[in-house]
């Protein structure tokens, strides 16, 4: 019997939010939808290199790769009290959204880590992406994804 080498997008999202970043604290928040989109996109590209299927389709957009399905899942998980979105106003950045798991989300992520065989293979990769990019300046992160994957940058017509 051949093992299925795929993971659901929503599970990837939970694991990304659960993972520590540079702070080494579990459930380190991800600041901004753009950052969340880019980190998940980069994770999926690394999974693709390992032959693991993923579920979020990304399309070209102004700020690079964008997934409507990811936005939909975030809204659903907020509604289900799995993800908490805190909206803060910054003098320098305008309105900013901060994403992290709720207690319910932490339980679900922990269950994934103990009950999903493929997670043991991919979780170290997820932690590495979060550690590397979660505190990177957002402009630099967008430029990085533009440079690495120019096919995901929407061409502005004018």
Predicted feature locations:
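Domain-edge interaction signal
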Residues: 1-158
